[in-house]
Amino acid sequence: MKLVIQVPCLNEEESLPATFADLPRSLPGIDTIEFLVIDDGSTDRTSEVARELGAHRVVRFPGRRGLARAFEAGLREALAMGADIIVNTDADNQYQGQDIGKLVAPIIERRADMVIGTRPIDQIEHFSPLKKFLQRLGSRVVRTLSQNDVPDATSGFRAYTREAALKLTVLTGFTYTLETLIQAGQKDIAITHVPIRTNGKLRESRLFRGMRAYIQRSLGTMFRVYVLYQPLRFFWSISSVFLIASAVLFARFVWIWIVTPGPPGHIQSVIVAGALAVIGFIVAVLGVIADLIAMNRRLTEEILLHVRSTRARDTSSREDPT
């Protein structure tokens, strides 16, 4: 069984030596371990340092594309290298490499296809109280959307089977952690989590410049991915609000018309009720159309899965003719 440990990097020449020194060279149940570095357009010697440290493969972008794109490129390259298991870790040595054995154990034992390393959020000293609260809140939202019980949704310390990696597609350009969890839940990928340890903080995060921007982009990612995979539920939920409001206003008009003698009044209630009903029906129809598009997308994903499997198999066969 072959394990590929991928490390997305951006200007990490100083932290890479500590990260590589912490990575395991052998593990029970694993025959081969190889290291893959994805250089996201670094302006320092990240790629050269990675090769000097013994990286088996270095993928370098000519310019910065973002963490999500680096992560997905790593998955595709790891598959081409013939990986049976892929572990993703950070280049800033945030996660302890000694825990990779714990991370891959559920996969080796065939208990999961995707394993998340759960950090002790409350014990991380450099996390502010606000950040700890938002981490817990965000994880709770993702658990609801993805229908899994992972307590640390933003952890980047993860292990994937070859089959899980083939199924995942990163659509947003911000961060992969939330999106892939929601995707995995929608695609029935077996997920579990294990407790892990963290190292001290080496530098500030390069993923976002402020908590507010991070929250906004994370919420946008979760919204887009949820609507992508649950369009009918989303649009019909909105439609039901308009239709219920329309029914209440129309019932109010009928009640007043029955109990009040003389010519009917409150015609404005009927007008507003009619407008709300039209909006509700339009939104419901949009939900049906979006659901049909989603069904077509699922068929496309099946074709993409077949193409990826064939391409990865052919590439790994050429690299390892034995």
What does each of the following model-derived ranges do?
Residues 171-322:
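Hydrophobic helical membrane-anchoring modules
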Residues 31-41:
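Short beta-strand/loop segment that forms part of the nucleotide-sugar
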